[in-house]
Amino acid sequence: MANLDVSQNTSDIHFSVSAADKVAELIKEEDNSNLNLRVSITGGGCSGFQYGFSFDEQINDDDTIVIQQCSDGKSSVKLLVDSMSYQYLHDAEIDYIKGIQGEQFVIRNPNAKTTCGCGSSFSIGDEDDL
């Protein structure tokens, strides 16, 4: 299991306070403080790759851990990204927004060359672009 030292928060993946607040709310609803938000990339979707969100108690040795303090200033949550997904998510921002279309997690990913209208699928350019 990975070391949970806060100094690991040197990732270039950005995890917004609003996303952290929503994750903390969902974890509280699940009544399991050991849960972390895992963001992953898998093949599929209409553009070639798709984002996945899940809760995970397990922190793997190759996970990048992003720790974000919640707006209450007291609690924090962990975002986990496996090493394969990390290459597609570097410099990305994971946010939680409320708008006309409802509430949702969104990923603003500068590595995506095209995105699907639904926002959950994307494609990249050449592998050299990563």
Swiss-Prot record:
Iron-sulfur cluster binds at C46, C116, C118. Its cofactor is iron-sulfur cluster. Keywords: Iron, Iron-sulfur, Metal-binding. It holds the Pfam family Fe-S_biosyn. Required for insertion of 4Fe-4S clusters for at least IspG. PANTHER family: IRON-SULFUR CLUSTER ASSEMBLY 2 HOMOLOG, MITOCHONDRIAL (PTHR43011:SF1). This is Iron-sulfur cluster insertion protein ErpA. The gene is erpA.
